[in-house]
């Protein structure tokens, strides 16, 4: 399916080719990271399955965000529907149409950044292609990585896709408003599965519909932004 990571190739990709691909991506990611740092922006790589609620989470973030200035790029194989939804929500947004690629890479993000003004932006979201496998291994230059996991997906998702959950800074459990309609499903069950593969990764439960948990999510983002501001101040030789 994808020529850049080789997940759709029938033959095994030689290690040296894979390493070259990742090295090239890492160079572009370093450039993106410097770009975000220069603008004082918290960059969030938001990953998750198709239908996990990534776009709805960002829409709810805009509604609950008060004076926070938000911007985003949205990756999909086709259409710019998610980016248009974000624009309607008041988020500066551009779409990245990947064609057959099942994840974003740093070069795609870099090209999209040329069309977004970052001055004055507090939080910048990279809404990755819906996928729990390949996006985890590609550095995009983000400050933090987050995975959205819906309560409808099954509490064993962290066990089935451990690499994703071990590579993120936060799990956002979405669609909490559906819990009353899902017998036997609980936040605790998801938490137990997550702890088996990623004991230290925090989990925040939210509902984009009711607003439950949104302040916890915003507080987490704000704290990460303070972290980068503190680090920048410490690195300033003046």
Residue ranges and their predicted role:
Residues 135-142, 149-200:
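Conserved C-terminal guanine-recognition region of P-loop GTPase G domains, centered on the G4
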Residues 5, 96, 204-206:
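Hydrophobic residues at beta-strand termini and immediately following loops
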Residues 179-235:
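Canonical P-loop GTPase G-domain recognition
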Residues 49-50, 73, 77, 150-151, ...:
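G-domain G4 guanine-recognition motif of GTPases
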């Amino acid at each position: 399916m994808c020529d850049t990571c080789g997940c759709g190739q029938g033959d095994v990709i030689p290690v040296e080719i894979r390493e070259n691909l990742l090295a090239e991506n890492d160079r572009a990611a370093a450039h993106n990271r410097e770009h975000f740092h220069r603008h004082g922006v918290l960059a969030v790589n938001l990953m998750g399955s198709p239908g996990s609620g990534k776009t709805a989470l960002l829409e709810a973030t805009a509604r609950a965000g008060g004076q926070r200035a938000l911007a985003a790029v949205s990756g999909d194989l086709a259409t710019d529907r998610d980016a248009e939804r974000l624009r309607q929500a008041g988020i500066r947004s551009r779409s990245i149409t990947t064609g057959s690629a099942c994840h974003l890479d740093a070069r795609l993000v870099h090209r999209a950044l040329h069309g977004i003004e970052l001055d004055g932006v507090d939080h910048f979201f990279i809404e990755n292609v819906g996928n729990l496998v390949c996006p985890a291994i590609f550095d995009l230059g983000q400050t933090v990585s987050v995975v959205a996991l819906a309560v409808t997906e099954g509490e064993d998702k962290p066990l089935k896709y451990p690499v994703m959950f071990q590579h993120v800074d936060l799990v956002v459990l979405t669609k909490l408003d559906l819990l009353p309609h899902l017998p036997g499903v609980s936040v605790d069950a998801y938490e137990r599965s997550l702890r088996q593969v990623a004991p230290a990764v925090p989990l925040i439960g939210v509902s984009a519909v009711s607003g439950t948990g949104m302040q916890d999510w915003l507080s987490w983002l704000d704290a990460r932004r303070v972290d980068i501001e503190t680090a920048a101040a410490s690195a300033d030789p003046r």
